[in-house]
Amino acid sequence: MAIRYVRKIGDEVLRKKAKPVTEINSHILTILEDMAQTMYLNDGVGLAANQIGVLRRLVVIDVGEGLLELINPEIVYEEGEQVGAEGCLSIPGVVGEVKRPKKVKVKYLDREGKEREIEGEDLLARALCHEIDHLNGVLFIDKAIRFLDEEEKEQVKEV
């Protein structure tokens, strides 16, 4: 396992669409482990593979309920609406309000290659949407309704 460099805004890999994983092998599992370690070290709640320069459809998320590893995630259902603050390890110092579904259902493969589904609400729904957007070359700044000023960012940190 290794800590990977998180690509920053301006790096063209962040704007590219990731390719599906066709075989789950030791290389893919190592990437997932590296992604989790990198996410935790950087105090993130999610990380997509292209954020570490790997154009494969891999996502790790932990919103405080344990690590989720998703291979080839796809949103199959969404409902409701929520607006909330988002930041990104690839866009340090920027926080914006983004409209997302309140609830989503995501189909994905686990590390054994079994098809799974997960339902997420609130923060988990937001994280799933944010990371899957990354896999499609979309950043939260593309969807932000507005950006928070320094005082507002401090208030968000305190919550």
From Swiss-Prot:
List UniProt keywords, sorted A-Z.
Hydrolase, Iron, Metal-binding, Protein biosynthesis
Which reaction equation describes what this protein catalyses?
Answer: N-terminal N-formyl-L-methionyl-[peptide] + H2O = N-terminal L-methionyl-[peptide] + formate
Q: How is the cofactor bound?
A: Binds 1 Fe(2+) ion.
Q: Name one GO molecular function term.
A: metal ion binding
- InterPro entries associated with the record: Peptide_deformylase, Peptide_deformylase_sf
**Which residues are noted in the entry as Fe cation-binding?**
C88, H130, H134
Q: Which residues form the active site?
A: E131
Give me any GO biological process, just one: translation
Provide the family line: Belongs to the polypeptide deformylase family.
Q: Which NCBIfam families match?
A: pept_deformyl, PRK00150.1-3
Per its database record, what is this protein's job?
Removes the formyl group from the N-terminal Met of newly synthesized proteins. Requires at least a dipeptide for an efficient rate of reaction. N-terminal L-methionine is a prerequisite for activity but the enzyme has broad specificity at other positions.
Q: What is this protein called?
A: Peptide deformylase
Q: Give the source species.
A: Thermoanaerobacter pseudethanolicus (strain ATCC 33223 / 39E)
Q: Its encoding gene is what?
A: def
